[in-house]
Amino acid sequence: MRIYLIGFMCSGKSTVGSLLSRSLNIPFYDVDEEVQKREGLSIPQIFEKKGEAYFRKLEFEVLKDLSEKENVVISTGGGLGANEEALNFMKSRGTTVFIDIPFEVFLERCKDSKERPLLKRPLDEIKNLFEERRKIYSKADIKVKGEKPPEEVVKEILLSLEGNALGG
């Protein structure tokens, strides 16, 4: 079993992923953390020194490497789940879960974040990116509302996984 969590930045993928992995008693991996470990740089530093294209390629490589593991929960970066090729790859290897949040919730959660390169863009550009990515994220196997407390999001995912296993 491989569970991939996708969604926009600040949707709660890492928090939910950590809790979900504990509930299932399987390891949790955060693609962003693994990218930073591999490069020895923060994500903003990678963007600045090597560019977004390099980061996106590396992110997909890390995803593929993590997907060699069995029985894992993998939290993806916001851009990875919006990459159709990456999303199709994840769907072929496991179950994709879209943690959906309203744009207003994203703004509230991310307002103090200095570590996210995409937040340097104008607000209307971020809103457009949010809407574009949401269309792709919606192709996930399971969709949950991420504005609820993380423990409730985990319960909803677990129920959906049970339903999928039973053919529901």
Swiss-Prot record:
Keyword Nucleus among UniProt keywords: no
E.C. code: 2.7.1.71
Cofactor(s) needed for function: Mg(2+)
Segments passing through the bilayer: none
Pfam families referenced in this protein's UniProt entry, alphabetically: SKI
Bound cofactor: record note: Binds 1 Mg(2+) ion per subunit.
Gene Ontology biological process: amino acid biosynthetic process; aromatic amino acid family biosynthetic process; chorismate biosynthetic process
InterPro entries attached to this UniProt entry: P-loop_NTPase, Shikimate/glucono_kinase, Shikimate_kinase/TSH1, Shikimate_kinase_CS
Similarity comment: family membership: Belongs to the shikimate kinase family.
UniProt function note: Catalyzes the specific phosphorylation of the 3-hydroxyl group of shikimic acid using ATP as a cosubstrate.
Protein's UniProt name: Shikimate kinase
Species per Swiss-Prot/TrEMBL record: Aquifex aeolicus (strain VF5)
